[in-house]
């Protein structure tokens, strides 16, 4: 098994953190991106836009949850799930919730780019 932690694109990960922090940005540097607000929905659209530029399957459900999938070798094996939330508390920190989402995206995108196919 290849080690991918050293292959993560740290610059892309940081730029995406900064980009998402602009959705609902407050004067104090925090965010107010409450669930299903315009800022939350726009952040979700940005996530989908990033993923549509890859070979990763992207889909949403009826309540705007975003799912992305990189097919593995064995289609019967259970998936690995990584996630978090894009919305924030009314006075959340700049990165409230987004790290888990962005970490999952960066991992799956790195696997895809490096042509590492999970079992």
Regions found by a protein language model. Give the residues of each.
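N-terminal hydrophobic or amphipathic helices/low-complexity stretches enriched
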Residues: 1-29, 71
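Short acidic, glycine/proline-rich loop/turn micro-motifs
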Residues: 31, 92-94
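Short coil/turn connectors at secondary-structure junctions
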Residues: 54, 75-80, 117-119
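Alpha-helical metal-binding/catalytic segments enriched in His/Glu/Asp
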Residues: 82, 94-119
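General structural feature for long, well-ordered alpha-helical segments within catalytic domains
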Residues: 9-16, 39, 43-47, 78, ...
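A non-catalytic alpha/beta surface segment that caps or lines the substrate-entry region
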Residues: 25-71
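Glycine/charged-rich beta-loop-alpha catalytic/anionic-binding loops adjacent to active sites
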Residues: 78-91
């Amino acid at each position: 098994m290849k080690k991918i932690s050293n292959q993560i694109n740290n610059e892309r990960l940081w730029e995406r953190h900064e980009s998402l922090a602009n959705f609902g940005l407050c004067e104090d540097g925090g965010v107010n991106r409450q669930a299903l607000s315009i800022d939350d929905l726009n952040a979700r659209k940005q996530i989908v836009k990033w993923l549509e530029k890859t070979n990763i399957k992207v889909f949403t459900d009826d309540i705007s949850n975003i799912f992305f999938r990189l097919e593995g070798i064995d289609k019967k094996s259970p998936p690995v799930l990584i996630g978090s939330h894009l919305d924030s508390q009314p006075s959340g920190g700049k990165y409230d919730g987004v790290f888990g989402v962005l970490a999952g995206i960066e991992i799956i995108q790195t696997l895809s780019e490096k042509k590492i196919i999970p079992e």
